[in-house]
Amino acid sequence: MRIQVNNEIEINYELTGDPKTQPVIALTHGMGGSQANWEADIPQLSEKYAVLRWDVRGHGDSDKPDAPYSAEIHARDLAGLLEALNINQVYCGGNSMGGAITQRFMLDFPHLAKAGFLMCTSSQVNPKMAGAWEQRATIAETEGMEAMTAAQSTFANANT
């Protein structure tokens, strides 16, 4: 489902459960991913939480404006999404780039964050690694997710 946030862009999201009767957990994916990355986690999380997954600006089915992106912009998008959905506070978490966005969100919008969790992330990009991140972003943009999947398949499967 898509919704306009901050009078600026449309964000794609999925909301499982009832945010009026359950605490909400907001999940933010990593670079080149989408809200679908959290699909396997939904059955267990939705037993206790309303689960909000969203496609970060420039990813999945969200708008892809032709402008620079930053953790600050993505954090503002999440705050705008919560406002548009009339959600006052969330537990929030993210992996990789999503973890960096989650940290920025918690710093910039502490009144919206009850608590957070971070996976495989950092608070800043090491200057030596900046080129590698740019390369990953370019591959995702020009060659698509199949190329990203091929590169990531060299890592161990955490579910085995």
Please describe what each predicted stretch is:
Residues 52-54, 95, 119:
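The conserved SAM/SAH-binding core of class I Rossmann-like methyltransferase domains
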Residues 72-90:
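Conserved acidic catalytic loop of the alpha/beta-hydrolase fold
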Residues 1-10:
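N-terminal cap/lid segment of alpha/beta-hydrolase-fold proteins
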Residues 9-67:
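Conserved HGGG/HGGXW glycine-rich cap/lid loop of the alpha/beta-hydrolase fold
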Residues 100-108, 112-143, 147:
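Flexible "cap/lid" loop of the alpha/beta hydrolase fold
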Residues 55, 91, 114-117:
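Residue in the alpha/beta-hydrolase core beta-strand immediately N-terminal to the catalytic nucleophile
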Residues 29-31, 90, 94-99:
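Conserved alpha/beta-hydrolase "nucleophile elbow" surrounding the catalytic nucleophile
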Residues 41, 74-77, 148:
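Hydrophobic alpha-helical packing elements
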